[in-house]
Amino acid sequence: EKERMKELVRKLNEAAKAYYQEDREIMSNLEYDTLYEELQALEEKTGVTLAGSPTTKVGYEAMDELPKEAHESPMLSLDKTKDVEVMRSFIGDHKTLLSWKMDGLTVVLTYHGGTLVKAVTRGNGIIGEVVTNNAKVFENIPLKIPYQGELILRGEAIIRYSDFEKINEEIEDVDAKYKNPRNLCSGSVRQLNNEITAKRHVHFMAFSLVSAPGQDFGNSRIRQMEWLKEQGFEVVEYKVVTRDSLDEAMKYFSEKIETNDFPSDGLVALYDDIAYGESLGTTAKFPRNAFAFKWADEQKETTLLEIEWSPSRTGLINPVAVFEPVELEGTSVSRASVHNIS
């Protein structure tokens, strides 16, 4: 089991490095989540967490090409589930905001004296990359706002499917086309030349207000979101729910996902009561005032071509299924680890 854990840590970290540092995907979200959950289960079973395990750290180191900067408050990942009942028990009797979990690149904006002064990517949650010049050419970001204090907010930079398709149509080389809007967005936001960013039609969807001294929001996240709209920001669409109205809201979101022009990979539940949510604190990795819901894994039928036996670094021989390529979450998949031949 320890050897399998070492192998999982290595594979997951390689995938994270490729994704966060090199803007490329070497495994699909689905495969990453499956391996991650296997590692979590083994860690729980053995009581051991290896150094470097992705279950105890977030993201990867930012690259050196753009200036780096530490976030004023660390950006933790969200705990997540695919089970609606887990979401229901999290929500309980609390008034909760249920919103899209946007699938792009998280960016933190700072305004001073009504002017955008800084934009920093999420990076590894502790240190991000400064992309202020690029943020200034996002399609819908307000460069000036009425509020004159120091405003810090978080949101997701995204590229809409319609824009993604137009950009891909202009690329003649099939191999050079982008696999999905998230990859294109990540590369666009982290450009060294913001003229390129400007051509990519990046949108910013605000999802969290970090601080706005002097403003009274009546201890309500809803009031914060409405205030951000008044300042000129486009905010992520949300519904206010309790456990009793959760099913109706889930139905609304699940039906709308089919026609959305923006990429999302689930939903986020956040308590409206700011003081209560903050009083819960955090675990080593997750805040306790929010929870993410992931849609059921995308499934595709394909044809198994052969089974290969792949020796791991530890000497174990693992079966690998080779099949006709299928698109899963925007990534072409043609191989997958299997547990046994039967």
What are these regions (language model features)?
Residues 1-342:
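RNA/tRNA-interacting regions in translation and RNA-turnover enzymes
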